[in-house]
Amino acid sequence: MSKTALLSLCLLVLPALAADQQWILGQSTLSYHVSHPLHQVDGVSHAARGKGICHAGQCDFLIAVPVKSFDSGDSNRDLHMLQVTRGAEFPMVTMRTRLPVSAATLPMINADLEIEFAGQTTRYRQVPFKLETQAGEIRITGIIPATLPDFKIDPPSLLTIPVKTEIPVRVDMTWRPE
């Protein structure tokens, strides 16, 4: 094979091999829900950051959000949440997942999630998420069925009555290719 043909082949093949895709988290709303017989509370954060790197047909995603970025509308309650979840010691919530590249074209996916929160790592299998594609971006919505015991957090109490252990986390994220 001549040097010119080899060079031409390299110029055509190498970019195709390096055509890995990356995704960046553009917008996010993550909200947890706490239920108590006397009231309901939602804490909301828009501070999540994330990146997805695709290679060999698989995409690895990492999302991170500061624990202190969740706002329930009551600064005293938010401070107590930071104490209960050991937010000073473990200031970030991280989530990892791996999805096939082809998942981006589906209307629904079931994702296996690994979430690290309050110093504990928990895995959730086959969590359903809805995908909507618009203008090259993908919006992902769903609910993570988290509980306080999953992360070894003792349920806080109000008037000696503990909150329910379920803390579903509503996810609404928009991803764009980088």
Map each language-model feature to its residues.
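Bacterial N-terminal signal peptides that target proteins for export
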Residues: 1-6
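Hydrophobic h-region of N-terminal signal peptides that target proteins for export
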Residues: 10-18
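Low-complexity, acidic/polar, glycine-enriched regions of mature
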Residues: 19-178
